[in-house]
């Protein structure tokens, strides 16, 4: 072949989705370069691994590249994209590059509106404990690995399948998981929920005849697509018709204790080192896949008991002092979470109530995208009204233009009318630490939450001397 790809360039390499693929390609021996608007821990890690990183986008950054990888967040007028077009360098969507990686191994793709990152991490951890040494590409940092991607020597690659832009339809895995189907990213589907469900049906059609669809039958929308799935199915969840089912579920000491009933295997007693019933569901998907791949029961149990979590998914920062008039006055427990859809937020609040019973729950929330705030406005009011104290910031736009009556102030006004919680509104995340310090008490549980820039706040809070 005359066109041999040796050098691959990533536009927006500092994002979690792009960086994972870039890291795997570095470890496969490719020359990798990339650019982003700012440096961060991800770009620093890739540079240490040997990738060439440029800060800022410029045509010269793609010099020598045989292919340029872009995500849907990259604009068509980006100077590197324009330069690639001018030089006839192939421009490859991120999902297509992930699909190429999947062609090298047997793919396990985790789809669903909520829970993808945690479920992907649990599957990768259980398979690793079973000696299968999978490659993984995750949308968050797997704490035990210190990274969101790893090149394994085994036959499997475990990755998230992104429905937000319908790019998961580029993937052709041998095992698929669908955790749930909910109304999010509806612009992609013309605000037609039937089109969204049809996309998930088409996703299952990507499986080969020997493939398996692992489906959570607790979710009514997943259950509705069952008749249209033409490949073998493993049903999981709490539902009586689940083939991998959790019973005797108890929350104790921030962990979930349950028994996994399996259709073709012995019951398995599990201690999951995560809180929340939604994480029991995520663990059941991992148990279903591990059982199918003949991972030993003891390895499944050990992996779930030792699971250290994923960055920004109910990530615990420990105890932080409460300062009052210049001196410490007790401490609060700090947790950070990526949740940005009302369903995810409700699951996290429920998990916190279960993990820390009887304690006051303080939430600092940054809404993500004006369109989501508009589309889920009443649901946001409902879930935010369930906490004991609230700091609310302006919406993180993610590049969107403001929408009238779908901003942070409108949300704060609606919450005051609802009358369940009095929000403290701040314009920027930089104001969150001071706003929290004015309301936090000894013994509180503080959760910082959102998919935007609020992710940098917990590290600032945790810099206070631990008690």
UniProtKB/Swiss-Prot annotation:
Where along this sequence does the record place binding of ATP?
112-118
Keywords recorded for this protein, A-Z? ATP-binding, Cell cycle, Cell division, Cell shape, Cell wall biogenesis/degradation, Cytoplasm, Ligase, Nucleotide-binding, Peptidoglycan synthesis
Q: InterPro entries annotated for this entry?
A: Mur-like_cat_sf, Mur_ligase_C, Mur_ligase_C_dom_sf, Mur_ligase_cen, Mur_ligase_N, MurCDEF_pg_biosynth, UDP-N-AcMur_Ala_ligase_MurC
Q: What class of enzyme is it?
A: ligase
Tell me, what is an example of a GO biological process annotation in this record?
A: cell wall organization
- The domain of life is Bacteria
One Gene Ontology cellular component annotation held by this UniProt entry: cytoplasm
Pathway(s) where this gene product acts: Cell wall biogenesis; peptidoglycan biosynthesis
User: Could you state a single Gene Ontology molecular function term?
Assistant: ATP binding
Similarity comment text for this entry: Belongs to the MurCDEF family.
Q: What does this protein do?
A: Cell wall formation.
**Know the name of this protein?**
UDP-N-acetylmuramate--L-alanine ligase
**Underlying gene:** murC
């Amino acid at each position: 072949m005359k066109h041999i790809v040796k050098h691959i360039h990533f536009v927006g390499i500092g994002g979690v989705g792009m960086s994972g693929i870039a890291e795997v390609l570095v470890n496969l021996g490719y020359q990798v370069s990339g650019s982003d608007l700012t440096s961060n821990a991800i770009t620093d890690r890739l540079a240490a691994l040997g990738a060439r990183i440029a800060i800022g986008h410029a045509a010269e950054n793609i010099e020598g590249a045989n292919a340029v990888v872009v995500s849907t967040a990259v604009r068509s007028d980006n100077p590197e994209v324009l330069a690639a077009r001018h030089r006839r360098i192939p421009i490859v969507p991120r999902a297509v590059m992930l699909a190429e990686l999947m062609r090298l191994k047997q793919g396990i793709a985790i789809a669903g509106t909520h829970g993808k990152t945690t479920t992907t991490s649990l599957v990768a951890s259980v398979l690793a404990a079973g000696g299968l040494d999978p490659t993984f590409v995750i949308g968050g940092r797997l704490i035990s690995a210190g990274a969101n991607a790893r090149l394994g020597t085994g036959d499997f690659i475990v990755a998230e399948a992104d429905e937000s832009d319908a790019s998961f339809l580029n993937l052709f895995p041998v095992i698929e998981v669908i955790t749930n189907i909910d109304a999010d990213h509806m612009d992609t589907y013309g605000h037609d929920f039937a089109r969204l469900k049809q996309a998930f049906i088409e996703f299952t059609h990507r499986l080969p005849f020997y493939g398996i669809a692992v489906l959570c039958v607790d979710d009514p929308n997943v259950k509705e697509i069952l008749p249209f799935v033409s490949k073998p199915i493993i049903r999981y969840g709490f539902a009586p018709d689940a083939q991998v089912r959790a019973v005797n579920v108890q929350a104790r000491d921030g962990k979930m204790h349950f028994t996994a009933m399996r259709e073709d295997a012995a019951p398995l007693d599990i201690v999951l080192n995560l809180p929340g019933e939604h994480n029991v569901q995520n663990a059941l998907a991992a148990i279903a896949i591990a059982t199918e791949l003949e991972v030993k029961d003891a390895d499944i149990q050990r992996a779930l008991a030792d699971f250290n979590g994923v960055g920004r998914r109910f990530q615990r920062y420990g105890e932080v002092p409460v300062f009052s008039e210049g001196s410490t006055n007790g401490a609060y427990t700090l947790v950070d979470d990526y949740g940005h859809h009302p369903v995810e937020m409700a699951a996290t609040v429920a998990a916190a109530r279960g993990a820390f019973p009887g304690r006051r729950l303080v939430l600092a929330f940054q809404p993500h995208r004006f369109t989501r705030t508009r589309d889920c406005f009443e649901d946001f009011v409902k879930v935010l009204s369930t906490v004991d104290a609230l700091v609310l910031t302006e919406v993180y736009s993610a590049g969107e233009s403001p929408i009238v009556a779908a901003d942070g102030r409108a949300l704060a006004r609606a919450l005051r009318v609802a009358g369940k919680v009095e929000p403290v509104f701040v314009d920027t995340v930089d104001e969150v630490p001071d706003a929290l310090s004015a309301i936090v008490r000894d013994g509180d549980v503080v959760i910082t939450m959102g998919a935007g820039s609020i992710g940098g706040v917990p590290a600032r809070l945790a810099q206070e001397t631990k008690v």
